[in-house]
């Protein structure tokens, strides 16, 4: 599995601000969008381009244009919505596919409770966004859904990832690409990433 820890100074700086314990909802939400945007910039660096001729102010001009690769952004509810706008800044014409997951209290396994996916996933690059890759369960289940619908090209964008989640994701879906602002130390006994960001969903939405 391709794993990219984006170490750009802007990413490191903004992520550091997100780790502050008493950060406001407004600041956390804005930074999630900004870091999501920077991760998207990295994740789309391999998109193919083609030469086309346009009418410029001085006549015909040859330019580069993205070569017909359609994109869908897939936020995992609810926290993933906080990164969605950062992706759309770069690919504003992308379709939005939404997946909702909850954890079964008995099995502790993620269970999908909502999905609204692009109808032509087999033709699209799916960019899945979720602030945290902790155990990897929700991400794996989401990718299972996408592949079941024919999606063949998937990139994952997370703000922080735990080594345990990366290992779990790679074991099941070695063909996906992972882009993260930080690979953190570990998961604690409650399944939280350390040092992590706390509960990203609560911080983005301001509700528990």
Curated annotation (Swiss-Prot):
Disulfide bonds: none annotated. Its EC number is 2.4.2.9. Uracil binds at residues 193, 198-200. InterPro entries: PRibTrfase_dom, PRTase-like, Upp_B, UPRTase/APRTase, Ura_phspho_trans. Binds 1 Mg(2+) ion per subunit. The magnesium is bound as Mg-PRPP. This is Uracil phosphoribosyltransferase. One of its GO terms (molecular function) is GTP binding. It is an enzyme of class 2 (transferase). Belongs to the UPRTase family. It comes from Histophilus somni (strain 2336) (Haemophilus somnus). 5-phospho-alpha-D-ribose 1-diphosphate binds at residues 78, 103, 130-138, 199. Its cofactor is Mg(2+). GO terms for biological process: UMP salvage; uracil salvage. Catalyzes the conversion of uracil and 5-phospho-alpha-D-ribose 1-diphosphate (PRPP) to UMP and diphosphate. Keywords: Allosteric enzyme, Glycosyltransferase, GTP-binding, Magnesium, Nucleotide-binding, Transferase. It catalyses: UMP + diphosphate = 5-phospho-alpha-D-ribose 1-diphosphate + uracil. HAMAP family: Upp_B. Pathway: Pyrimidine metabolism; UMP biosynthesis via salvage pathway; UMP from uracil: step 1/1. Allosterically activated by GTP. The lineage of its organism: Bacteria, Pseudomonadati, Pseudomonadota, Gammaproteobacteria, Pasteurellales. NCBIfam families: PRK00129.1 (NF001097), upp (TIGR01091).
């Amino acid at each position: 599995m391709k794993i990219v820890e984006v170490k750009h100074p802007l990413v490191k700086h903004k992520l550091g601000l997100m780790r502050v314990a008493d950060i406001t909802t407004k600041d956390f939400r804005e930074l999630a969008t900004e870091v999501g945007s920077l991760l998207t910039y990295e994740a789309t660096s391999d998109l193919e381009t083609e030469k086309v001729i346009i009418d410029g102010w001085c006549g015909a001009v040859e330019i580069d244009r993205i070569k017909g690769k359609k994109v869908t952004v897939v936020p995992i509810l609810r926290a993933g919505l906080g990164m969605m706008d950062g992706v759309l800044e770069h690919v504003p014409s992308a379709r939005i596919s939404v997946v909702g997951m909850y954890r079964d209290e008995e099995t502790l396994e993620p269970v999908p409770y909502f999905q609204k996916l692009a109808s032509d996933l087999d033709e699209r690059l799916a960019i899945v966004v979720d602030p945290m890759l902790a155990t990897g369960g929700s991400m794996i289940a989401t990718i299972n859904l996408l592949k079941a619908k024919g999606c063949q090209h998937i990139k994952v964008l997370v703000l922080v990832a735990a080594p345990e989640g990366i290992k779990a994701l790679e074991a099941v879906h070695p063909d996906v690409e992972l882009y993260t602002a930080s690979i953190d130390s570990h998961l604690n006994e409650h399944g939280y990433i350390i040092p992590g960001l706390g509960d990203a969903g609560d911080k983005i939405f301001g509700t528990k």
